[in-house]
Amino acid sequence: MAKEELVEFGGRVSEVLPDSRFRVTLENGFEVWAYSSGRLKKNRIRILAGDRVTLEMSPYDLTKGRINYRHKV
């Protein structure tokens, strides 16, 4: 069985929440909950409010996502 296709969105972190979760405002104006990917946690990449990020989201639940890249300033 093939892995489901993920949808990528760009956005900006609007709030840092406990337990390495974030509230992200997407480029189209929607707000979603997001968490750091394992690669970001492993390499101890810090994500702060105001950072531009790229999210992966399931097409079945567009309210939650996984942050897989933090853009450079």
From Swiss-Prot:
Its main location: cytoplasm. GO terms for molecular function: ribosome binding; rRNA binding; translation initiation factor activity. It is found in: Cytoplasm. Residues 1-72 form the S1-like domain. GO terms for cellular component: cytosol. Disulfide bonds: none annotated. Keywords: Cytoplasm, Initiation factor, Protein biosynthesis, RNA-binding, rRNA-binding. Belongs to the IF-1 family. Component of the 30S ribosomal translation pre-initiation complex which assembles on the 30S ribosome in the order IF-2 and IF-3, IF-1 and N-formylmethionyl-tRNA(fMet); mRNA recruitment can occur at any time during PIC assembly. One of the essential components for the initiation of protein synthesis. Stabilizes the binding of IF-2 and IF-3 on the 30S subunit to which N-formylmethionyl-tRNA(fMet) subsequently binds. Helps modulate mRNA selection, yielding the 30S pre-initiation complex (PIC). Upon addition of the 50S ribosomal subunit IF-1, IF-2 and IF-3 are released leaving the mature 70S translation initiation complex. This is Translation initiation factor IF-1 3. The gene is infA3.
